[in-house]
Amino acid sequence: LSGQSSERNLGALREEMDAVTLEMVRLLSRRSGLARRIGEAKRGIGAPVDDAARQASLRSKVAAACAGEGEAAMASRLLNFLINESVQVQSDAAPAAATSHTAIFQEAKRLEEEGHDIVHMEVGEPDSAPPEHAAAALAAACAAGHTKYGTAPGIAELRDAAAEIESVHGTPLTRENVIVTMGARFAIYLAIESLLSPGDELVVIEPAWPAYAQCAMRAGVKVTRVRTTLESKWEPDISEIESAITPNTKMIAINYPNNPTGKVLPARRQREIIDVAARRSLYVLSDEIYAPYSLVEWHSALESGHDRTIVTQSLSKSHAMTGFRVGYAVAPPREAQRMARLQSLCLTCVPTPVQHAALAALRAEPPGAARETLERLRGLAPMAAEAGLEFDGPDGAMYVFGRLPRGLDGGEVALECLRRGLAIAPGAGFGGYGPFVRLSACREAPVLARGMDILNSVLSGGGP
């Protein structure tokens, strides 16, 4: 009888759980509908989709509701998931942004296909050819039969070469610390997706390349933004970073030299950020693809010795191998293994012939792409200042990130420039910096001068 009673009790509990679950599903559907309506209202008044103050207020209400219930941690993670879903619903319902830098690039390519001449200053793509020895190694690998499936972490020789290069920063590394990836973008995705869970939080310092936040949101990870300003010379306030960290925070993303500002943090400030992460046992995801493009002293995050550091690198920038789609990540062995398992699921491995091309590139002397681009950047900066843009530095990378005069909107200026044959990147795509534009220095000096003539004409109100 006691067994039958227990079985009936179990059945009743399951029925109650089913009822609660179905009610949650109904409430989620209702909540998504409200999110869409809120998104429409925001668009009507020009309000941003992401509202940090509103999210903080809701978080406080949830914490108060959980007091004494013992479920605060789970409720907080669930709230992060719900916030992400609301942001995604509102973003998906919004008309596609016509002025993101990717949208500008795609439209510029379409115009070129129609026969229009476009000056490309919207993308950070070196215009030099890949190293000849890399192209030769690609062909040789195919001829030698290196065309089969490879292992997810990458070929051993390439991982050894990357480990040797990155060991100069003071942390001894082996191939077990390296995973070869489809460019740095995919390395960033692998790090976020494999090391964080839905409901976790990632701190991003803005202005920032949008892929950090995009990868996080696709993984169900809540993005907390720490905003920097031109007036502060793009240096983050350590107290603001500390305030942004919650019990759900698992990672801080940094990128120096920075895209889009070209900022290189002083060693002391970068160390302070990493120390904050170390005290909280957080991962530091350091995107260091612009390391060769520095006009001032630069330090890798690996120099800190923090044992939860992940560094991403790409041969796109260092060796002008953008179309090869190859890079790598440096991480503790356990984390590298987790990233490799996810890469195996997503794409098996980086194409083996491409890895042999990358190996040849890393073994040779670095090409002159960085040196050439930095010279162009030095020439672009005074032209941007003469056009009336306000900016700091830049200390490196390949961009000028400038505030437009007279409060002009970067998106509107970018569209008008494109109509006249110049593609530039609006600042809004890098974290809500609407009055800014990003100018890339990856073209020959005469081409950059022609592009700046177009920008000057637009800013002065002149005709086509």
Language model segments and positions:
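A glycine-/small-polar-enriched, mobile loop at the entrance of the PLP active site in fold-type I
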Residues: 119-127, 140-158
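Aromatic/hydrophobic pocket-lining residues that form π-stacking "cages" and hydrophobic walls in ligand
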Residues: 38, 62, 82, 104, ...
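PLP-dependent class I/II
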Residues: 111-114, 125-126, 132-133, 138-141, ...
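Conserved N-terminal alpha-helix of the aminotransferase class I/II PLP-enzyme fold
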Residues: 149-181
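Amphipathic alpha-helical segments within well-ordered protein domains
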Residues: 39, 60-67, 163, 340-343, ...
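N-terminal basic, amphipathic alpha-helical segments
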Residues: 64, 92-109, 114-136
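Domain-level signature for soluble enzymes in the chorismate/prephenate branch of the shikimate pathway
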Residues: 1-95
